[in-house]
Amino acid sequence: MAAETKALIFAANILTLPTFMRLPLFILILAFTFTSCSKFAKVQKSTDYDYKLRMAEKYYVAKKYNNAQQLYEELFPIYKGQPQFEDLFYKYAYCSYYLKDWLQAENLFKQFTEVFPTSQKAEEMEYMRAYTYYRQSPKAELDQTNTQKTIGLMQTFINTHPGSTRLKEANDIIDKSREKLEQKEVKSAVLYYNMGHYLAAGIAYSSLMNNFPDSKNSEEYKLQVIKSYYLYARNSIDEKKAERYEKVLSECNDFTDRFPDNPLAKDVERYRNLSQSNIKEIQNEQAKKTD
């Protein structure tokens, strides 16, 4: 934790002290903060670049990333092409990462691999670039562009570095990202169903099965397809009901083929029987009309 941050926390704690004790301590904190800022200002003004680089390293090690970042940025054009530049670039990129400036960090990690493609740190930078997208991935309800980019870049990393020690981490992140995409689609399907848009719900649940064939919830999605199409058929105009109940039967048969001896088979059988009964009733009504 940076000294300035500790000082601010300490200042907040002072407010709980008796009034007569607060002023001396506030003065002490202000003096400490002013001294720290004054010292950094002197470093910035220095024209001794080696000294500034040493101080940047010192701030970096002390986790004062904001100070380190400012110095590295000033030194960037000075050391470009020099032996120190690779390490400077590496730490400059990480400053943005530790400051949670994900967009800047992603850009710098990418640039590092372009400037130093044969560096021993290039593999790490490729991984970190993908990881910054993962850190930007929002809740399932929101746009999942960054989640999709995470999956794409992590998969590229795995393909490019099959012997990397980071493979397990990369695969775990892909799995978590895919779970989030799946969750987003589930929420959409549930919303359609709850709103009574049963055709849209049936299509959405079918898409879930196609998009996530290895999902542990595939059987439940298939049952929801059946339920959605059944309710769609039941609420249809008379002329369309029979063919839509046939669609339910087709989905029931598909469930049996895909998931034999599944515990949900009883529910599927109920919708099969209901659909068959309704089709038979429709056929009987049609037969009466022709008599």
What are these regions (language model features)?
Residues A11, L25, F34-D291:
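Acidic, polar-rich low-complexity tracts and alpha-helical solenoid repeat scaffolds
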